[in-house]
Amino acid sequence: AFTDHYIRLVEGFGKQAVIWGALTHAKGDTPVKSENIIMNAWYNGYADPATMIKDGYQLISIPDAMVYIVPLAGYYQDYLNEVFLYKEWTPAHIGKAVFEEKHPAILGGMFAIWNDHAGNGISVKDIHHRVFPALQTLAVKTWTGKETSLPFEVYNEKRSAISEAPGVNQLGRIGKSPALVYERSTVAPGSTSTYPEIGYNYTVSFDITGAPEKSGTELFRSPNAVFYLADPIRGMMGFARDGYLNTFPYKVNPGEKATIQIEGDHRSTTLRVNGKVVEEMNIQKCYFNAGKDSMSYIRTLVFPLEKAGNFNSRIENLKVHNYRVSK
């Protein structure tokens, strides 16, 4: 009764109803309208696709085990298996049910990202890092099905040269091959940069001569993140983004001279001082409910470069590489 009621309510506003498949699992006694109704076929145990097609529904192929992303959850996928999807999957594959290619009742395919674990440190940038390559691959497969024109390895190489969209660079890519992509001999307080940020993978290094700094003193900021010389709470080196503050067990003392290096990728952020690792902020396992439950916590950073803060320390020899130099 619930599903049929809301289908008709939606249609009453002149809209086409789209529902998530559940009518095998929760069939009920009330007949449910199927004419001109689109159903997301996500789990065959909840909605058997052959039965749903027979009943008159139009399907969108979105099989959970194949195309669901749940970041750092430990179930479903953290990143889609694009090699498998490119080589083996088409919208005609709904879980273990396989239909004829271009079946008239299957409108196409989709993927989904579900952020089930609030508080796990995943940033908007991390979500985009998962979504964009999946979007590219699903676009190929929903347009071409089995008739892909390139081997995956060639496709994977060629797509790296394509921008996300005109004027869009959410991944923070600088340069197309591993290189030193930006440098400055000195960084003056309040100065601006050619680039707003650099995304994974990267290495940012600089020489510092320490001076007294107030808590909250920024080295760089962008619209998406802040890197602190002295964080607002403990005065340590660290960074903030998406409502999370992560700090390293290190601060520059007045008069101290040091070479600082920060490396970042899609799983970690590492601080080195004078060539020695201070901390590699990789994925943590956090426990709660008296230790009965746990959740992964990630501490990634798309490094901000847009504007320097109002610091007192001297910053020299800034170098930005678009790869991790230690790897």
Predicted regions and their residues:
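Active-site neighborhood of glycoside hydrolase catalytic domains
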Residues: A1-I38, W42-G56
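Carbohydrate-binding surfaces of carbohydrate-active enzymes
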Residues: I7-Q16, A22-L23, G121, P133-Y200, ...
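Substrate-binding cleft of secreted/luminal carbohydrate-active enzymes
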Residues: P63-V70, N81-R159
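Extracellular glycan-recognition modules
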Residues: A179-G238, I315, V320-V325
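Beta-strand-rich interaction surfaces with strong enrichment in secreted/lumenal proteins
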Residues: S191-Y195, N246-V252, A290
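Short tryptophan-centered beta-strand motifs in secreted/extracellular beta-sheet-rich domains
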Residues: V204-F206, E256-V273
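Short, aromatic/His-centered strand-loop micro-motif at the edge of beta-sheets
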Residues: M237-T259
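Flexible glycan-contacting loops in extracellular carbohydrate-active proteins
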Residues: V278-E316
